């Protein structure tokens, strides 16, 4: 069987070696006589899986000891609703910087609980740039400042960590975590749905400075209290064990490949290939994002019309290049180049782009 190159924005491609190991261990895992999905999450066997996943993630991301690591059910949208409940008092101001679609989603989730203030918004310019930090209107007593590190739909990425002074900086890293070195101490909290760079859909990671967990937040059920989850090692309720196991395999694979530094180099190479094909096409392919904030993970581009976009998607699929259709909110084409996408995938896409232009340009 030949695997195609999968450019899906998420759920996204996973390392083939991880998938094959999971396939082998699905029915019977580690000599216990049962599948990993069948054993208790409180058994010594699974506790070892969970501990290894956290230890490897701490190594991969250089997570300091004064930061807690949570593995949570669900995705980033759930986390966005829980942030104000855990870290802001009722009616307290929180600042949000909107650089694309998912920044707006984060605001929608927080609005029922706190006084959401938009510190900056790239919408007037069409989300092709991020407003400079000097132009942000920050609330002096905000509970936190929230950014979306990488916007998968508009293809806009923070290339540097913004300086927000003494305010805690919270960031959605769902689509760019582990893609390049990150100084976690610059953040109060980062979070990520796993289904792009860390593993399968259904589990997320929250990395939070422990002192922030002492905040009273708002009245909430224990299941929505991050401090309670930390106290119970992310097992306050039954966790998604299969997803946790796959996340652990994926993180271990990333370490074996050379860690974040190696992926940063690889990701830069892949992005340069695709952007080079776009910029060198004489306008046949178009990407309007400012070069200083172009995403390395998600590259949207457009052809002359919707019919040509559709033809590109259908012909690329026939050529073994999957899931290149752009998000419904913007249309066009989108290539997602997460860590598990090899350079060969970007090379195959660029070769197809050149061929398609020759035939239809």
UniProtKB/Swiss-Prot annotation:
Any Pfam family the entry gives? Aminotran_5
The UniProt entry's GO CC annotations, sorted and at most eight, read: cytoplasm
Q: What class of enzyme is it?
A: transferase
Q: Does the keyword Transferase apply?
A: yes
- How, per the record, is the cofactor bound? Binds 1 pyridoxal phosphate per subunit.
A molecular function (GO) held by this record is: pyridoxal phosphate binding
Main localisation? cytoplasm
Tell me the Gene Ontology biological-process terms attached to this UniProt entry. L-serine biosynthetic process; pyridoxine biosynthetic process
Q: Which residues carry this modification: N6-(pyridoxal phosphate)lysine?
A: 196
Q: Where does L-glutamate bind?
A: 42
- Give the EC number(s) under which this enzyme is classified: 2.6.1.52
The subcellular location is: Cytoplasm
Q: Which cofactor does it need?
A: pyridoxal 5'-phosphate
**What pathway, per the record?**
Amino-acid biosynthesis; L-serine biosynthesis; L-serine from 3-phospho-D-glycerate: step 2/3; Cofactor biosynthesis; pyridoxine 5'-phosphate biosynthesis; pyridoxine 5'-phosphate from D-erythrose 4-phosphate: step 3/5
Q: Which reaction does it catalyse?
A: O-phospho-L-serine + 2-oxoglutarate = 3-phosphooxypyruvate + L-glutamate; 4-(phosphooxy)-L-threonine + 2-oxoglutarate = (R)-3-hydroxy-2-oxo-4-phosphooxybutanoate + L-glutamate
- List, alphabetically, the PROSITE patterns matched: AA_TRANSFER_CLASS_5
Keywords in alphabetical order: Amino-acid biosynthesis, Aminotransferase, Cytoplasm, Pyridoxal phosphate, Pyridoxine biosynthesis, Serine biosynthesis, Transferase
The cross-references to InterPro entries, in alphabetical order and at most eight, read: Aminotrans_V_dom (IPR000192), Aminotrans_V_PyrdxlP_BS (IPR020578), Pser_aminoTfrase (IPR022278), PyrdxlP-dep_Trfase (IPR015424), PyrdxlP-dep_Trfase_major (IPR015421), PyrdxlP-dep_Trfase_small (IPR015422)
* Subunit structure, interactors included: Homodimer.
| HAMAP family reported for this sequence | SerC_aminotrans_5
Give a short account of what the protein does.
Answer: Catalyzes the reversible conversion of 3-phosphohydroxypyruvate to phosphoserine and of 3-hydroxy-2-oxo-4-phosphonooxybutanoate to phosphohydroxythreonine.
Question: What is the protein's name according to its record?
Answer: Phosphoserine aminotransferase
């Amino acid at each position: 069987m030949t695997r195609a190159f999968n450019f899906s924005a998420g759920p996204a491609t996973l390392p083939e070696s991880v998938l094959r190991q999971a396939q082998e261990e699905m029915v019977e895992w580690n000599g216990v006589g049962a599948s990993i999905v069948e054993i208790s999450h409180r058994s010594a066997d699974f506790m070892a899986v969970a501990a290894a996943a956290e230890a490897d993630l701490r190594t991969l991301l250089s997570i300091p000891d004064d930061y807690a690591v949570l593995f949570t059910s669900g995705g980033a949208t759930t986390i966005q609703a829980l942030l104000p409940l855990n870290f802001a008092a009722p009616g307290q101001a929180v600042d949000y910087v909107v650089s694309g679609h998912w920044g707006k989603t984060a605001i929608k989730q927080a609005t029922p609980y706190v006084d959401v203030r938009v510190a900056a918004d790239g919408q007037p310019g069409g989300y092709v740039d991020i407003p400079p930090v000097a132009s942000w209107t920050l609330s002096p007593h905000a509970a936190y400042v929230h950014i979306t590190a990488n916007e998968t739909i508009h293809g806009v990425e923070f290339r540097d960590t913004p300086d927000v002074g003494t305010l805690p900086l919270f960031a959605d890293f769902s689509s760019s975590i582990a893609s390049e070195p990150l100084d976690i101490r610059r953040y109060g909290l980062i979070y990520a749905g796993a289904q792009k760079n860390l593993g399968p859909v259904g589990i997320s990671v929250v990395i939070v400075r422990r002192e922030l967990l002492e905040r009273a937040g708002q009245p909430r059920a224990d299941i929505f209290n991050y401090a309670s989850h930390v106290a119970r090692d992310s097992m306050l309720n039954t966790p998604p064990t299969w997803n946790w196991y796959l996340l652990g395999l994926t993180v271990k694979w990333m370490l074996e490949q050379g860690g974040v530094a190696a992926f940063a180099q690889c990701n830069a190479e892949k992005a340069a290939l695709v952007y080079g094909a776009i910029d060198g096409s004489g306008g046949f392919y178009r990407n309007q994002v400012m070069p200083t904030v172009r995403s390395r993970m998600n590259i949207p581009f457009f052809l002359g019309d919707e019919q040509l976009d559709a033809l590109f998607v259908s012909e690329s699929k026939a050529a073994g290049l999957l899931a290149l259709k752009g998000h419904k909110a913007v249309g066009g084409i989108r290539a997602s180049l997460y860590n598990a996408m090899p350079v060969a995938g970007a090379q195959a896409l660029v070769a197809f782009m050149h061929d398609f232009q020759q035939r239809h340009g």
